From Swiss-Prot:
Molecular function GO terms recorded: DNA binding; RNA polymerase binding
Name of the protein described by the UniProt record: Transcription elongation factor GreB
Source domain of life: Bacteria
Function, in words: Necessary for efficient RNA polymerase transcription elongation past template-encoded arresting sites. The arresting sites in DNA have the property of trapping a certain fraction of elongating RNA polymerases that pass through, resulting in locked ternary complexes. Cleavage of the nascent transcript by cleavage factors such as GreA or GreB allows the resumption of elongation from the new 3'terminus. GreB releases sequences of up to 9 nucleotides in length.
Pfam families from the UniProt entry: GreA_GreB (PF01272), GreA_GreB_N (PF03449)
Family per similarity comment: Belongs to the GreA/GreB family. GreB subfamily.
Name of the gene this protein is made from: greB
InterPro entries: GreA/GreB_C_sf, TF_GreA/GreB_CS, Tscrpt_elong_fac_GreA/B, Tscrpt_elong_fac_GreA/B_C, Tscrpt_elong_fac_GreA/B_fam, Tscrpt_elong_fac_GreA/B_N, Tscrpt_elong_fac_GreA/B_N_sf, Tscrpt_elong_fac_GreB
GO biological process: DNA-templated transcription elongation; regulation of DNA-templated transcription elongation
Alphabetized UniProt keyword annotations: Coiled coil, DNA-binding, Transcription, Transcription regulation
Coiled coil region boundaries: 53-75
Length: 171
């Protein structure tokens, strides 16, 4: 499946920061270390030189990837007209058949982070949720079989886990 080119504004900024950090901070340090290691003589048995060159290749590969990727990514900001329906960037609280609640945020594939409960817009769950609204039922084909979710809440700002369900976090 093709990778979407959508990203949230904060996701784009994070990738841009990573690019600048690698290019302006980490690469010069590693380049200097490699230069110093090369000055020590025989490079064939010089572990610092060998591993430094390897790290430099990794940095250069990541820098090339980020530079190219940032050129094609499209920043998607929430639109007030989206309220009430699930679209890119939404935080969605769902409940499954076992009455277990889960929260997902629909983000671009470059932002996917299970620890944050951020799922790719290209994932089966996200594709099933797009365009739906509160009280809608969605069925998703997963590697473990079908999963059914009911949409309980949709937001375009983070949920506050410490507040009761459906309480507005601005209060």
């Amino acid at each position: 499946m093709a990778k979407s080119n959508y990203i949230t504004r904060e996701g784009w900024q994070a990738l841009d920061r990573e690019l600048h950090y690698l290019w302006r901070e980490e690469r010069p340090v590693v380049t200097q270390a490699v230069s110093e290691a090369a000055a020590m003589g025989d490079r064939s048995e010089n572990a610092e030189y060998i591993y430094g060159k390897k790290r430099l290749r990794e940095i250069d590969r990541r820098v090339r990837f980020l530079a190219k990727r940032l050129e094609v990514l499209k920043i998607v900001d929430p639109d007030p007209r989206q309220e009430g329906k699930v679209f890119f960037g939404a935080w969605v609280r769902v409940e499954n058949e076992q009455e277990e609640q889960r929260i997902f945020r629909l983000v671009g594939p470059d932002e996917f982070d299970p620890a944050k409960k951020w799922i790719s817009i290209d994932s089966p769950v996200a594709r099933a949720l797009i365009g739906k609204q509160v009280d809608d039922e969605v069925t998703v084909q997963t590697p473990n079989g079908e999963a059914t979710y009911w949409i309980l809440e949709i937001r375009y700002r983070p949920f506050d886990e410490d507040r009761p369900f459906n309480e507005d976090i601005d209060n």
